[in-house]
Each structure stands twice: as structure tokens, then as C-alpha cells.
């Protein structure tokens, strides 16, 4: 994490339980991020919060530290049964739940608290075996949690801490009825510590907070900045004929360490994957049709560096928390302004620099004014020289319906890989000055 992203508040100076302090110190957490510095002093007084913060700001560690500290500092409810977790953390997607659980396990190392995770798309019985052994902190998606509640496998009547993460996405995905169902089965709001985090604190999110929380304190960092200052944004106006060649050329020039390419439809994403794979890139595809096990495998490959580029729709990418994404390419401008903010928020996280490149093509250019109005600034326009775009581009490959996406690695076949700015043919010079000129 970049030091410029941190505050002057030290975790060691906060009134935290010794076991929490030890876990933080051993994992290299010394200074708080701004959202942690603002929210933890409130939460450590057992006051509820409704926090507004973008992804990558450290909000996950903020609510995990508060949750662990609260459970370690609060007596266990009298008569608590093995099927009664003491804390529940609700997330909109499997991927986010998995990431939260990984961070929670870091803090759980020196405590007696057990962490369990449940989500759809995985073995029901395997997850049930974990629950049958008893968990203190339950992390998961609402649908699977409700399944276990309705069957009596878990009871929420001993809950002492509640976290609702990415509440705005909960609304987008239609999970609010599920959330209210779960809240109604917990102790009263004044008998538990309640935490809500959201990228935007819209009226509907605030209404949810005040309905199910105990006079929450609003914690807001950079409320007027919907996009991070660490992200360099630019937009091109390509013709439909140039659009794919422009993307391939920009990727060739930028040679991103780790990039996500967003498109608005499944068909367009599949087409993008075919061209990128054919051009020799290590690329994975995420759409709503990708099976859960394959989805997890692709994300692991992308996170570990086996894949350099991820092509995704908005629905498939919701809840992704992947570090070190250097570039985001909006092949299509999204129809929803909030989706633009969520897309580019995949890069420039935790104080790091990021690049966002958008295409305002003939089909989606009319979305740009609304996006710029929503983010309160104009996106710098970049021009390009059509004659300098790549021409010797291999034909797209067919999607391997029975094989993992992104398994072909033409770079490795060619040897040690292409140097930055060099094309497959070897002799072509970098096009940084020929292809892009800013106006």
C-alpha cells in the first residue's frame, strides 16, 4: 500500500484488544488509511456507522478490526448454541465474500474466533460441515445464508456485530429483501454493533441504514470525488472500423501489467476475448455464463499473474477485488454512470497509480455527457492516427467451450516474451508517438 494513502493514525495508538493489535502488527499494518482513521474511533465506542468509501480504501480492514475487537471485548451471549454465529458479514458477490474471508483469517490467527464462509455455486454439504462445527464470524452472500437460516442450520439470534458491505450493489442486484429478512431475525439494533459501507450513500441506502441500525454516524471520505485522483482518465472517439485495432494497439503500446477490459454485452466480451487471444495475449473471459468453478480458476490465474488481461461484463465483474490492476479499458461506455465509477475503481487502488481508457464509439458516445456530469469533471480527449494502428493482426480464435479460457500463451512459445512496444513481427518500432496524440 502506498504511504501517501495512509493517515498519521497508528493502529497501536487505538484502544484495540491486544490480540487484534498483535495480528495487525504481524501483517504489517502500522498506519490507518483515512477511512480506518475516521471509522475505528467511532466503532470502538460501540457506535454504529454508515460509511461512504470507494473500493481500495481499506474499508474491509476497518470493519474487520472493529468486528474482531467487539467480539473479543464483549461477553458471549448467555446460552449461545453452536449454530449461533456472533457476527455476520454480508457481501453482494462470492468473490467479495472470499476476499473478506481471506483478510479475516489474518486477524483470526491469534484469537479464539472461528471464521466461516458460505456462498452459492459451491457444495452445500461442504459448507454445512463447517457451520456444524460452529463459527463466530459468518461471512457470505445473502442467498446462501438465508438457505441455512430457513433450514435451522444457523440461527441469528446471538448476533452481536453486523456488516453490510457494498450496500449500493446490494440494491443493484436486488438483494434488499434478503437483507431485511436477515435483519428481522437478529437481536434489536441497539443490542449489536452495526456497520454499513457503500460507494454511494444514496437515499435508499441511508433509509436501509436508519431502518436497521442504531442512529448510525455517517463517515464520508472525499464525498465530492467519485473517482480517484490516482487514476489517469482519457477517452478516444474511434470509428467502429478502428475500434478493435485501436484497443490492440493501445495494449501493445501500454503493455499493462494487469488490465481489465469492460464491454456491455456477453457477445462483445466473447468477441474481445477471441481477438486478444488470437493476438497472443494471456487473457481470461468473465461473463454471466461462466461456471462458478471456472470463474474462480480464471480469477486465481489473473491474480497470480498467469493471465495479464481480463475481459468482463459489469455483472460478472461485480465484487471483484484484485490488487495491482494497472489499466482499465472501457471498450464500451457503460449505460449506467455508477458502473463507470465502479469499473475504473478497479485500478488506482490503495494509493497506487492507475490508467482508465474509454472508447466513445458511435453506439455508446451519447453516454459520455451523463457520465461526466455524474463524476463532476470532463474526461480528457485523446486523438489517434488511424494509419498508425496495427495492421498485421492475427485472426480471432474460437472460444474453447470445453477448455479454460486464456490457456494459450503465444508469448511463451515465442521465447521470453515480447519487449514493451514490440510487435510479434519483431521489427516494428514502438508507436507511442505515432498512434496517440493528446489535444
Curated annotation (Swiss-Prot):
Specify the Helicase C-terminal domain's residue ranges: 243-390
> Which residues does the record give as ATP binding sites?
53-60
Q: The Helicase ATP-binding domain covers which part of the protein?
A: 40-219
Chain intervals for the UniProt region annotation (Disordered): 398-439
Query: Which terms are listed as keywords in the entry?
Result: ATP-binding, Cytoplasm, Helicase, Hydrolase, Nucleotide-binding, RNA-binding
Which regions span the lipid bilayer? none
Provide the Gene Ontology terms for cellular component. Answer: cytosol
Main EC class the enzyme belongs to: hydrolase
As annotated in the record, motif DEAD box runs over 165-168
* Annotated InterPro entries: DEAD/DEAH_box_helicase_dom, DEAD_box_RNA_helicase, Helicase_ATP-bd, Helicase_C-like, P-loop_NTPase, RNA-helicase_DEAD-box_CS, RNA_helicase_ATP-dep_RhlB, RNA_helicase_DEAD_Q_motif
Q: Where is this motif: Q motif?
A: 9-37
Reported EC number(s) for this entry are 3.6.4.13
Kindly give the PANTHER family that the UniProt entry links to this protein.
ATP-DEPENDENT RNA HELICASE RHLB, ATP-DEPENDENT RNA HELICASE RHLE-RELATED
Would you identify the family this protein belongs to, as annotated? Belongs to the DEAD box helicase family. RhlB subfamily.
**Assembly, per entry:** Component of the RNA degradosome, which is a multiprotein complex involved in RNA processing and mRNA degradation.
Please identify the protein, giving its name as recorded: ATP-dependent RNA helicase RhlB
UniProt source species: Shewanella sp. (strain W3-18-1)
Q: What is the lineage of its organism?
A: Bacteria, Pseudomonadati, Pseudomonadota, Gammaproteobacteria, Alteromonadales
| Gene name per UniProt | rhlB
Amino acid at each position: 500500500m502506498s504511504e501517501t494513502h495512509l493517515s498519521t493514525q497508528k493502529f497501536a495508538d487505538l484502544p484495540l484488544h491486544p490480540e487484534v493489535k498483535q495480528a495487525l502488527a504481524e501483517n504489517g499494518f502500522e498506519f490507518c488509511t483515512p477511512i480506518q482513521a475516521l471509522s475505528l474511533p467511532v466503532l470502538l465506542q460501540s457506535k454504529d456507522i454508515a460509511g461512504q468509501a470507494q473500493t481500495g480504501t481499506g474499508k474491509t480492514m476497518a470493519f474487520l478490526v472493529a468486528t474482531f475487537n467487539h467480539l473479543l471485548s464483549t461477553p458471549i451471549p448467555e446460552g449461545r448454541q453452536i449454530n449461533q454465529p456472533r457476527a455476520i458479514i454480508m457481501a453482494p458477490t462470492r468473490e467479495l465474500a472470499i476476499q473478506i474471508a481471506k483478510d479475516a483469517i489474518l486477524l483470526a490467527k491469534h484469537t479464539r474466533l472461528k471464521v466461516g464462509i458460505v456462498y452459492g455455486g459451491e457444495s452445500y454439504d461442504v459448507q454445512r460441515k463447517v457451520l456444524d462445527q460452529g463459527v463466530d464470524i459468518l461471512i457470505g452472500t445473502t442467498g446462501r445464508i438465508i438457505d441455512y437460516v430457513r433450514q435451522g442450520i444457523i440461527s441469528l439470534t446471538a448476533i452481536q456485530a453486523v456488516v453490510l458491505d457494498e450496500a449500493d450493489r446490494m440494491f443493484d442486484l436486488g438483494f434488499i429483501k434478503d437483507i431485511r429478512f436477515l435483519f428481522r431475525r437478529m437481536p434489536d439494533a441497539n443490542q449489536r454493533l452495526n456497520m454499513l459501507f457503500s460507494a454511494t450513500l444514496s437515499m435508499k441506502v441511508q433509509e436501509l441504514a436508519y431502518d436497521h441500525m442504531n442512529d448510525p454516524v455517517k463517515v464520508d471520505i472525499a464525498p465530492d470525488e467519485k473517482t480517484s485522483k490516482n487514476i489517469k482518465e482519457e477517452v478516444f472517439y474511434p470509428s467502429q472500423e478502428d475500434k478493435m485495432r485501436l484497443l490492440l494497439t493501445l495494449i501493445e503500446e501500454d503493455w499493462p501489467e494487469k488490465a481489465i477490459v469492460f464491454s456491455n454485452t456477453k457477445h462483445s466480451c466473447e468477441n474481445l476475448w477471441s481477438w486478444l487471444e488470437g493476438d497472443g495475449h494471456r487473457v481470461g473471459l468473465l461473463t454471466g455464463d461462466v461456471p462458478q468453478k471456472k470463474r474462480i480458476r480464471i480469477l486465481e490465474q489473473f491474480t497470480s499473474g498467469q493471465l495479464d488481461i481480463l475481459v468482463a461484463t459489469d455483472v460478472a465483474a461485480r465484487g471483484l477485488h484484485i490488487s495491482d490492476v494497472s489499466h482499465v479499458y472501457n471498450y464500451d461506455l457503460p449505460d449506467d454512470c455508477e458502473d463507470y465509477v465502479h469499473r475504473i475503481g478497479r485500478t488506482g487502488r490503495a494509493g497506487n497509480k492507475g490508467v482508465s481508457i474509454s472508447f466513445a464509439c458511435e453506439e455508446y458516445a451519447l453516454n459520455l455527457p451523463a457520465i461526466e456530469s455524474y463524476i463532476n469533471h470532463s474526461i480528457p480527449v485523446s486523438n489517434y492516427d488511424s494509419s498508425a494502428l496495427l495492421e498485421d493482426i492475427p485472426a480471432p480464435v474460437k472460444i474453447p467451450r470445453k477448455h479454460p479460457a486464456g490457456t494459450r500463451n503465444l508469448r511463451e512459445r515465442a521465447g521470453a516474451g515480447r519487449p514493451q512496444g514490440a510487435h510479434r513481427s519483431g521489427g516494428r518500432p514502438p508507436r507511442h508517438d505515432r498512434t496517440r496524440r493528446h489535444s
